[in-house]
From Swiss-Prot:
Locations listed in the record: Cytoplasm
Identification of the protein by name: L-rhamnose isomerase
Record lineage: Bacteria, Bacillati, Bacillota, Bacilli, Bacillales
Cofactor note: Binds 1 Mn(2+) ion per subunit.
SUPFAM superfamilies the UniProt entry points to: Xylose isomerase-like (SSF51658)
Function text: Catalyzes the interconversion of L-rhamnose and L-rhamnulose.
Major place of residence: cytoplasm
Metabolic or biological pathway: Carbohydrate degradation; L-rhamnose degradation; glycerone phosphate from L-rhamnose: step 1/3
Alphabetized UniProt keyword annotations: Cytoplasm, Isomerase, Manganese, Metal-binding, Rhamnose metabolism
Record GO biological process: L-lyxose metabolic process; rhamnose catabolic process
Alphabetized GO MF terms: L-rhamnose isomerase activity; manganese ion binding
UniProt organism field: Listeria monocytogenes serotype 4a (strain HCC23)
Length: 420
């Protein structure tokens, strides 16, 4: 009780300090509580899935490390996810890939149906979570010569077109059952290792294949689709068919959400700078918040400059209503539950930091060319008691404050993970 009282006291002091510059902390906390983060399932087992868990991870991505305790079954993964969600304030979503089927049937990617994900839906209902989805265009024998939907081989294309169509029905099923729109994100890793002669034709094939996948109109109350670009991957260093320009054009002309992954661009390029432009021309955005270290390494999200900028762009430009925030990282060198907790809580913190700015006043100063005040206030804000507001948010949402969550993760590791 003593700690709770101390947290509340510190919050009251922080509240008054923010109030003095025109910031309503209660409003900020209410807004933050309503923001759902789509936490990705694949951190829990290093992107192996349950369709062919012993198969090779392909698609130009890589999970490094061998930390003990990875989930090997859907039940174990759900148990780990429950632990992670219990340490994160608010109610959120889970982002599933197609390879995370939960069925005793022997089923291939072009055969999956909603029934193969029913245990996930029942669990999500119990936990009060929404579900997002992703067709899996990698780690499969039909990922041939680095191609799926853009393959010159019609048999290969047709296999993946069918997979894409079936993924849409699964996402629709999630939306209907859970009462929350399910975002179905299409990332296709097709590409070439060395300089291609023909960049145009594979892109035409990809466009036509996607058009076939999306031919049936589905109710967007239940499912919305996003398309995700990438600059390069391992084995596709010279050319990726689904580039940023390709998917920006495709998304805008086909009325799809555009997915921006923080690691899918040139190392000096940031997605925070793209959000305001896409907001003007696209129907909306799906974010994959990640941390690239010199390449698309999918490191756990930390409170770095880009994460802070993403939060600012979403809040300052009032883009939260058209943005779906998801995470995408997988680090097998650390405790996987800790990875989820650190990444998700940091994403929430970046949003709270932005919500605690006097945005309207700062915009007015900028409009009036009062750059002196703009700089002075934004710099002074760096020393404001943001941490006390965050700790209070954790307390009122019934999750551990400060590093207390780490004790729970360590205990869970000892009791559960190390016994697997």
């Amino acid at each position: 009780m003593g700690q709770e009282t101390e947290i509340s006291k510190r919050y009251q002091v922080a509240k008054e300090r923010y109030q003095a510059i025109g910031v309503d902390t209660e409003k900020a906390l209410k807004t933050l509580k309503d923001i759902k983060i789509s936490m990705h399932c694949w951190q829990g087992d290093d992107v192996k899935g349950f369709l062919n868990p012993d198969g090779e991870l392909t698609g130009g991505i890589m999970a490094t490390g061998n930390y003990p305790g990875a989930a090997h079954t859907p039940k174990q993964l759900r148990q780990d996810l429950e632990k992670a969600y219990s340490l994160i304030p608010g109610k959120h979503k889970l982002n599933l890939h197609a390879i995370y089927v939960d069925t005793d049937e022997k089923v291939d990617l072009n055969e999956i149906e909603p029934k193969h994900f029913t245990p996930w839906v029942e669990w999500a209902k119990e936990q009060g979570l929404g579900l997002d989805f992703n067709p899996t265009f990698f780690s499969h024998p039909m990922f041939k010569d680095n191609y799926t939907l853009a393959s010159p081989d019609k048999e290969v294309r047709d296999f993946w077109i069918e997979h894409g169509k079936r993924s849409r029905k699964i996402s629709e099923y999630f939306g209907k059952e859970l009462g929350q729109t399910s975002i179905n994100n299409f990332w296709v890793p097709d590409g070439i290792k060395d300089c291609p002669i023909d960049r145009y034709t594979p892109r035409k094939r990809l466009m036509e294949a996607l058009d076939e996948v999306f031919a049936e109109k589905l109710d967007e109350k239940y499912t919305q689709e996003a398309v995700e670009s990438k600059l390069f991957g391992l084995g596709a260093e010279a050319y990726t068919v689904g580039s940023h320009e390709f998917y920006m054009g495709y998304g805008i002309t086909r009325d799809k959400l555009i997915c921006l992954d923080a690691g899918h661009f040139h190392p000096t390029e940031v997605i925070s700078n793209k959000l305001s432009s896409l907001a003007l021309f696209s129907k909306g955005v799906m974010l994959h918040v990640s941390r690239p270290v010199r390449w698309d390494s999918d490191h756990v999200v930390i409170m770095d400059d880009e994460l802070i900028e993403i939060g600012r762009e979403l809040v300052r430009n009032d883009l939260l209503g058209i943005t779906n925030i998801g995470l995408d990282f997988f680090d097998a060198t650390i405790n996987r539950i800790a990875a989820w907790v650190v990444g998700t809580r940091n994403t929430q913190k970046s949003l709270l930091k932005a919500l605690l700015e006097p945005t309207a006043d700062l915009k007015k100063m900028e409009l009036e060319n009062d750059f002196t005040s703009r700089m002075a206030i934004t710099e002074e804000l760096k020393d404001f008691p943001f941490g006390d507001v965050w700790n209070y948010f954790c307390e009122i949402n019934g999750v551990p404050v400060g590093l207390d969550w780490l004790k729970e993760v360590k205990a869970y590791e000892e009791d559960v993970l190390l016994k697997r």
